[in-house]
């Protein structure tokens, strides 16, 4: 039996910081999600991660991808994992404490 969490993970990868900031802003405004953080992948790529209920993460990632595309050719990928396996949790950045 897989050990999974009930919290979804949304990821948007961009070319550059400006599209990443635009995507993060749109995602957090569009739905009840928590911004987990951003990762500088290298070569100018930035990945923004959000967590929340699956429906909210879906809406947030859609809004973030749309916003990122309005900035230019910044969107590289957008992906959602509905139920993250507990072992994957260990490699994710920790959410900032409120």
Curated annotation (Swiss-Prot):
Name the record gives this protein: Major carboxysome shell protein CsoS1A
Functional note: The major shell protein of the carboxysome, a polyhedral inclusion where RuBisCO (ribulose bisphosphate carboxylase, ccbL-ccbS) is sequestered. Assembles into hexamers which make sheets that form the facets of the polyhedral carboxysome. The shell probably limits the diffusion of CO(2) into and out of the carboxysome. Molecular modeling shows the central pore of this protein is selectively permeable to anions such as HCO(3) rather than CO(2) or O(2). There are estimated to be 2970 CsoS1A/CsoS1C proteins per carboxysome (the proteins differ by only 1 residue). Unlike beta-carboxysomes, alpha-carboxysomes (Cb) can form without cargo protein. CsoS2 is essential for Cb formation and is also capable of targeting foreign proteins to the Cb. The Cb shell assembles with the aid of CsoS2; CsoS1A, CsoS1B and CsoS1C form the majority of the shell while CsoS4A and CsoS4B form vertices. CsoS1D forms pseudohexamers that probably control metabolite flux into and out of the shell.
Species in which this protein is naturally found: Halothiobacillus neapolitanus (strain ATCC 23641 / c2) (Thiobacillus neapolitanus)
GN (gene name): csoS1A
Applied biotechnology: Expression of 10 genes for alpha-carboxysome (Cb) proteins (cbbL-cbbS-csoS2-csoS3-csoS4A-csoS4B-csoS1C-csoS1A-csoS1B-csoS1D) in E.coli generates compartments that resemble Cb, contain RuBisCO and have its catalytic activity, showing it is possible to make artificial, functional Cb using these 10 genes. Cargo proteins can be targeted to these organelles. Artificial Cb assembly in E.coli requires csoS2-csoS4A-csoS4B-csoS1C-csoS1A-csoS1B-csoS1D (but not the gene for carbonic anhydrase, csoS3).
Domain notes: The tight homohexamer forms a pore with an opening of about 4 Angstroms in diameter which is positively charged.
Keywords recorded for this protein, A-Z: Bacterial microcompartment, Carbon dioxide fixation, Carboxysome
Matches recorded under InterPro entries: Bact_microcomp_CS, BMC_dom, BMC_shell, CcmK-like_sf, CcmK/CsoS1_BMC
Gene3D superfamilies attached to this UniProt entry: 3.30.70.1710
Assigned protein family: Belongs to the bacterial microcompartments protein family. CsoS1 subfamily.
């Amino acid at each position: 039996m897989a050990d999974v969490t009930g919290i979804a993970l949304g990821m948007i990868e961009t070319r550059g910081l400006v599209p990443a900031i635009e995507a993060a802003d749109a995602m957090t405004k569009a739905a009840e999600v928590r911004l987990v953080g951003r990762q500088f992948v290298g070569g100018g790529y930035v990945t923004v991660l959000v967590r929340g209920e699956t429906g909210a993460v879906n809406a947030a990632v859609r809004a973030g991808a749309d916003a990122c595309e309005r900035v230019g050719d910044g969107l590289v990928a957008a992906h959602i994992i509905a139920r993250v396996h507990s072992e994957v949790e260990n490699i994710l950045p920790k959410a900032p404490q409120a």
